[in-house]
A protein has these predicted regions:
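A short, flexible beta-alpha/helix-coil linker loop
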Residues: 118-122, 212-215, 281-282
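Radical SAM/AdoMet-radical enzyme domain recognition
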Residues: 133-150, 159-278
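Radical SAM enzyme [4Fe-4S]-AdoMet core and its adjacent flexible, acidic
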Residues: 220-226, 238-403
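Generic domain-boundary/flexible-linker signal
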Residues: 29, 53, 123-126, 160, ...
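Short, solvent-exposed loop/turn segments at secondary-structure junctions
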Residues: 45, 212, 250-252, 281, ...
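Conserved alpha-helical substructure of the radical SAM core
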Residues: 34-58, 63-198
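Radical SAM enzyme core and accessory elements
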Residues: 1-81, 330-468
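Glycine-rich, histidine-containing beta strand-loop boundary motifs that form or position
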Residues: 104-106, 116-119, 153, 181, ...
Length: 468
């Protein structure tokens, strides 16, 4: 007897949330038409089918990039309602804070149509220095020694106590300090940039850089920022302040510029890499339709491979601590030549040991500008302030004498989940966390859905339903 088949292949089971009411729902992971989808059903709002990946082999590869979890030194909240309603961090979480975000204001000198924080000139909150110091202390209590702390906003550079805040951060055990900025003050105030340079080493600018096109910038940022960005980069190049370009991506708007942004970044003295961040359906998302304009991590990865002159399919790989949401590629900048490194690294090197470290030793191939993976060292001592101070979940690179951080270029994809594609398996491994004023560390994905501003009042409603 011939029996009917499903139009898809069942892969796995997980928990998600309804995109409309945010209640927890069961979800299937399926393969259909060379793509990965999440099928979920809410008893109030019915079925949803969400695209998770456009690359089944890569999705399956992510399942292999797993490593033992690295824990914080304490937990901030108990387990009571279940993920994602207990943030955080609760004892059910599976990753410490690789990147801790401290928002020092919600005031901004732009009102971007796309902004997960909903910042604007109309907002009024400036956190005072004592509050911010307590937020730094929360990080240190959790981490003992923090890998990366990002000062964010709003626009942090317009905070009246900005440099005092940086001074307080530098007093603490923080390996790498980063400032997330739209670049306006950096472009217009060279004395400000000169003072920023005094915080090197272990200091970096995370510079908003979405497009080279006026219409795109108007849609994403509400203003043509091309001249501002160029002036900002000129100042950062002049003082050689390590910079990561961060591009928010919207399908059909600026995803065709991925290769151009990478190439331009490699040509700048100060730029150490580019981070691509597909829009998360959270906060202010004007003129954005998540049903047609959302980008998956796999689509961004495929565009990098397609558009970049440097990176091939083997060069952009999952980040072991959070493979569903992070992918990376390293390259070496030498004499104007870009040489990808990731494809020559055995994936087992990325997965072994408590702290991933890749050591490149000098040999004949190196002298010929070809680097060879030589050994694994779990407790490296680097002669320069370099890649070891970046996201701890990325492989660390010790380069031979005479080479430094400025010789390494990295591409990173950060795909934060939202009410459509949230998967509790992935949320539990989130390593990018917001610091709150009440001594909590909350994953980026869940913070913008449940915990930011007035959203927690609705979360309380969901929690009450669970314990009835």
């Amino acid at each position: 007897m011939i029996v009917p088949n499903r139009p898809y292949t069942y892969s796995d089971f997980t928990l998600s949330i309804c995109s409309k009411c945010l209640r927890k729902v069961e979800a299937k992971i399926i393969y259909e038409n060379d793509c990965v989808y999440m099928l979920k059903r809410c008893m109030h709002h019915g079925m949803e089918k969400v695209l998770i990946s456009t690359d089944i082999p890569y999705y399956q590869l992510c399942r292999e990039f797993i490593k033992p979890s690295e824990m914080p030194h304490r937990w901030n909240t108990p387990i009571k309602y279940g993920c994602p309603y207990d943030c955080g961090l609760c004892p059910d979480h599976e990753q410490h804070s690789c990147l801790s975000i401290v928002e020092i204001t919600d005031v901004c000198n732009l009102q971007c149509p796309i902004c997960y924080a909903e910042s604007s000139p109309k907002r009024t909150t400036w956190k005072d220095l004592e509050t911010i110091k307590r937020m730094f202390d929360t990080i240190i209590k959790n981490e003992k020694e923090a890998d990366v702390v990002q000062i964010s906003g709003g626009e942090p550079t317009i905070h009246p106590q900005f440099f005092e805040i940086l001074d307080e951060a530098k007093k603490r055990s923080i390996k790498h300090l980063m400032v997330n900025t739209n670049g306006i003050r950096i472009a217009t105030d060279e004395a400000f940039v000169k003072r920023l340079a005094s915080y090197k080493p272990g200091f970096e600018i995370y510079l908003q850089f979405d497009s080279f096109e006026e219409e795109t910038l108007l849609e994403l940022r509400g203003r043509d920022l091309r001249e501002v960005r160029q002036k900002a980069i000129n100042h950062l190049n002049k003082y050689n302040i390590s910079t990561t370009l961060v591009a928010v991506l919207k399908k059909g708007l600026n995803d065709h510029e991925i290769g151009k942004i990478i190439k331009w970044g490699t040509e700048q003295k100060c730029v150490r890499g580019v981070t691509f961040q597909p829009i998360q359906h959270a906060g202010r998302t004007e003129n954005y339709d998540p049903s047609t304009e959302r980008l998956t991590l796999s689509e961004v990865r495929q565009e990098i491979i397609k558009q970049s002159e440097f990176y091939s399919e083997n060069d952009i790989i999952p980040v072991p601590c959070h493979p569903d949401s992070l992918a990376m590629g390293y390259a070496l900048k030498m004499g104007g030549k870009i040489t990808p490194l990731t494809s020559i690294i055995d994936k087992n090197v990325l997965l072994e040991g408590e702290r991933n470290t890749i050591v490149f030793e000098s040999d004949e191939e190196l002298r010929n500008k070809v680097f060879k993976l030589f050994s694994l060292n779990h407790s490296p001592q680097s002669g320069f302030q370099g890649l070891k101070d970046l996201l701890c979940c990325l492989p660390k690179v010790i380069l031979p004498s005479g080479m430094g951080y400025e010789n390494v270029f990295r591409v990173l994809i950060m795909k934060f989940q939202d009410n459509y594609d949230l998967d509790v398996r992935s949320v539990k491994k989130s390593c990018v966390h917001f610091v709150t004023t009440d001594d909590k560390m909350i994953p980026f994905d869940t913070y913008n859905l449940f915990y930011r501003d007035d959203k927690e009042s609705y979360l309380e409603t969901l929690r009450e339903e669970i314990i009835r």
